[in-house]
């Protein structure tokens, strides 16, 4: 399968600036770039689909460059509804360093920073050398600008698209970049760069956008209860990422396999058939989790996440290490435990049971487990010998309600 055909089959092409791009991707070796502004010191899983296409294009012989917007990050891409909050120079510099390291470590990309070529351009030079080529009416026709005109848009935000156009022209001059790839929300910024090069009598530049990856409810992939899933495993553990991916809706999982993995067309179609025959096995979800986590963090991290999941499901808490327990129970209710606290007091004081009578009922019914083992003695006391790693005790009520007790 040729490059463009592969991208189309995977649903990775939304808009292209010229029909010529298909032939160029299939038969030439292009240098292209993908950019991100440093709003945080780590990429999140939503970036993953965008940057994975760069790796995919590289496998077809094209050369990727990642641009981290040390300059544009100081301005902020206009949001559809309101002005974006500016971040400090110190934050931007810290975030640039984090993203640059991550791009090298995960994707192996060459990284450039647009602050390097914008920092010495004066306002006069910017307006004379670049601003004179872009008509205001052209900028007003951008969708994002149209949406903001009624509520108001600052000149700072208005000029953002011209700064990104400057990036494209500069990357072409310095690195031979002829293609920008981005999410569909960046189409207006891509076309500004193409127009700027044309007006400056430069070479023809090309753009391609990808559809946003959405879940079954139309929410952007990677958004979970308002929290981002980070590619930095110190911010989002492999187990947390595993849980997110393994719970992918059946309606979306094949689409995700196409867009977020390097599995072949034949392999994905085989998985799809098995998923239809036995949806309860969730073979597609496990395949997705394995491919994504292994790519980001390695096979060992995937196996670790899988082990935590299996042990938690089976109740084999004692087979888990302290670190695995902390990963697996990061979001469950936790509380302090004192030496020789009675089991009944532990349940009542921490709202696991509403009263001592209810606590006794839970215990006698076998509904309470400590570190995976049922406790049926009402007089049981919990001492530090129960503490896994000398720190934590895992309490379960019923089949799914977990709590984490921490010895102090």
What are the functions of these language-model segments?
Residues 1-33:
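Positively charged, low-complexity intrinsically disordered leader regions
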Residues 10, 88-96, 100-209, 214-216:
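Divalent-metal (Mg2+/Mn2+/Ca2+)-assisted nucleotide/phosphate chemistry catalytic cores
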Residues 21-78, 180-187:
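N-terminal catalytic cores of NTP/NDP-binding nucleotidyl/phosphoryl-transfer enzymes
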Residues 59, 63-76, 83-107:
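Well-ordered mid-protein domain cores that form the structural environment of catalytic cofactors
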Residues 73-84, 171-175, 225:
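Acidic/polar active-site rim loop that often engages polyanionic ligands
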Residues 76-80, 121-127, 219-225:
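Short acidic, glycine/serine/threonine-rich loops at helix termini
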Residues 200-408:
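Conserved nucleotide- and phosphate/pyrophosphate-binding catalytic cores
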